[in-house]
Amino acid sequence: MEAGMAEAGVKLEDSWKHVLSGEFASPYMQKLKEFLLAEKTAGKRIFPKGAEYFRALDLTPLDEVKVVILGQDPYHGLGQAHGLCFSVQPGVRIPPSLVNIYKELQSDLGIRPVKHGFLESWAKQGVLLLNSVLTVEEARAASHQGQGWEKFTDAVIRAVNDECDHVVFLLWGSYAQKKAAFVDQRKHLVLRSPHPSPLSAHNGFFGNGHFSKANAFLVSHGRDPIDWQLPDVVEGDKNLL
């Protein structure tokens, strides 16, 4: 699959390529490649674009991971998904779950909400913004579940667990919390709460203090904290011009 992905313009950062090479050689990844090709051949629009399937890994090398935030699958609206969970491209309306994440950041750390939903600055500091499923068909939520991506991203989580020390896993909602099974909590910190969705945020996401707890854990182990304050303006955000 790696060669096929390379032909599609996909990037995979070297440290990840090293630990995930066995996944790319596996039969399930070949089947996943065939599935995606068939979907595109049938004229279906797939999000994000091929070059951004592995954007979370590209922006956050394995040896730089400090925090892992797990999502389920990409946004399925036009122009939203770009390979980072919860994040949307510049100029796109901030989704409700991310609005609630911003509210908790303000309550927890006094972080000023911004008017965009572009989270790349977190990724570049070591926050792995990983969806469990890395593609989706336009307007069909969860349409690519069960095609192999889950096995791949489970391998990503296992790699972080095995290769890194003192990482914080923020597991929001029951789906993400299942991934705690791959994490050695003797060396990593797992924080659980309800999902930031408007359907569940008031049941314990608000007030969870996860962002301050994550930074306190990092500092206690000699790691630099995350600057959760996003830049006010990002390139390409027409809403802010």
UniProtKB/Swiss-Prot annotation:
One of its GO terms (biological process) is base-excision repair, AP site formation via deaminated base removal. GO terms for cellular component: cytoplasm. Keywords: Cytoplasm, DNA damage, DNA repair, Hydrolase. InterPro entries: UDG_fam1 (IPR002043), Ura-DNA_Glyclase_AS (IPR018085), Uracil-DNA_glycosylase-like (IPR005122), Uracil-DNA_glycosylase-like_sf (IPR036895). Its main location: cytoplasm. It is found in: Cytoplasm. Its EC number is 3.2.2.27. The active site is at residue 73. GO terms for molecular function: uracil DNA N-glycosylase activity. SUPFAM superfamilies: Uracil-DNA glycosylase-like. It catalyses: Hydrolyzes single-stranded DNA or mismatched double-stranded DNA and polynucleotides, releasing free uracil. CDD domains: UDG-F1-like (cd10027). It comes from the Bacteria. Excises uracil residues from the DNA which can arise as a result of misincorporation of dUMP residues by DNA polymerase or due to deamination of cytosine. NCBIfam families: PRK05254.1-1, PRK05254.1-2, PRK05254.1-4, PRK05254.1-5, ung. Belongs to the uracil-DNA glycosylase (UDG) superfamily. UNG family. This is Uracil-DNA glycosylase. It comes from Agrobacterium fabrum (strain C58 / ATCC 33970) (Agrobacterium tumefaciens (strain C58)).
